[in-house]
Design a protein with these regions (language model features):
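A short, Lys/Arg-rich alpha-helix, primarily the initiator
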Residues: 1-13, 50, 59-60
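DNA major-groove recognition helix of helix-turn-helix/homeodomain DNA-binding modules
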Residues: 43-62
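Generic structural marker for isolated residues within well-ordered, non-membrane alpha-helices
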Residues: 6, 17, 46
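Residues in the recognition helix of alpha-helical DNA-binding motifs
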Residues: 9, 23, 34
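Short alpha-helical "recognition helix" segments of helix-turn-helix
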Residues: 19-21
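Recognition helix of helix-turn-helix/homeodomain-like DNA-binding domains
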Residues: 26-41
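Charged low-complexity stretches with an acidic bias
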Residues: 64-68
């Protein structure tokens, strides 16, 4: 997962790096580093985020918000 796709995934989920750090029990600096060149999101975290995004997309498709 690239820094760009990592940030895009968090944005689609409505999450921040700080919030993700709390959920994962990791330091804010560690999670923030994943947005920088030369760092990478660990494979297990990337897979978990992709599963969360898939679940979110299914949920939004199957139960969309009410129309205005």
């Amino acid at each position: 997962m690239t820094p760009t796709s990592y940030l895009a995934t968090l944005a689609r989920l409505g999450w921040t790096p700080a919030g993700l750090a709390r959920q994962l029990g990791r330091s804010g600096n560690t999670v923030a580093n994943w947005t920088r060149p030369g760092y990478r999101v660990p494979d297990d975290v990337a897979a978990w985020l992709e599963r969360r995004l898939d679940a979110h997309d299914r949920w939004m498709r199957d139960d969309p918000p009410p129309s205005p």
